[in-house]
Amino acid sequence: MQKMAMLMACLACMGLAAAFSPATLGVNKPSHRQQAPVMSQVARRELLSKVLGAAALLGAASADAKVNYDAVAYLGGAQQIDVNNANIRVYQKLPGMYPSAAGKLCTNGPYVDLKDMYAKAKLSKEEEAIVKEFDKDFLFLKPQIEYVVDNLNNGLYRR
């Protein structure tokens, strides 16, 4: 699949180079006579455009994106929260958690379990007391790069 993608990239570059060559034959004729070309420039350009068109149609690769994440409900849509993947805004629903304790949970993860979370999160005594109220709601699933990258800033801004 990568070979096909590389071929497509090469063919696309060749198409761009052809776009900047003179469109009509004989616009800048030299003063002396040249030997007749075996294949005319126009025919070569037409052949190249057909090859590129066929390559684009036949070689279009499907995206390998992860479409469905099984635990998406735990990112804020369910009672339980996946601590390793949830965005900081999810903790706004939990009184006293946002922004201080939630920020520390998101910054110092990922965690294996509750014990690991309390050891790594660097919570103050007050924050730890607040977080303990919600222990039953926390899950510790495997971190997914698609969600960990947005733990602190999901890029959604209000006007």
Curated annotation (Swiss-Prot):
GO CC annotations, alphabetized: chloroplast thylakoid membrane; extrinsic component of membrane; photosystem II
Keywords tagged on the record: Chloroplast, Electron transport, Membrane, Photosynthesis, Photosystem II, Plastid, Thylakoid, Transit peptide, Transport
InterPro entries cross-referenced by the UniProt entry: PSII_PsbU
Disulfide bonds: none
Subcellular localization, as worded in the UniProt entry: Plastid, Chloroplast thylakoid membrane
Main subcellular location: plastid
Membrane topology: Peripheral membrane protein
SUPFAM superfamilies: PsbU/PolX domain-like (SSF81585)
Keyword DNA-binding attributed: no
Any one GO BP annotation for this protein: photosystem II stabilization
Quaternary structure and interacting proteins, as annotated: PSII is composed of 1 copy each of membrane proteins PsbA, PsbB, PsbC, PsbD, PsbE, PsbF, PsbH, PsbI, PsbJ, PsbK, PsbL, PsbM, PsbT, PsbX, PsbY, PsbZ, Psb30/Ycf12, at least 3 peripheral proteins of the oxygen-evolving complex and a large number of cofactors. It forms dimeric complexes. Part of the oxygen-evolving complex of photosystem II.
Role played: One of the extrinsic, lumenal subunits of photosystem II (PSII). PSII is a light-driven water plastoquinone oxidoreductase, using light energy to abstract electrons from H(2)O, generating a proton gradient subsequently used for ATP formation. The extrinsic proteins stabilize the structure of photosystem II oxygen-evolving complex (OEC), the ion environment of oxygen evolution and protect the OEC against heat-induced inactivation.
Entry's family note: Belongs to the PsbU family.
Name of the protein in question: Photosystem II extrinsic protein U, chloroplastic
Species of provenance: Karenia brevis
Name of the gene: psbU
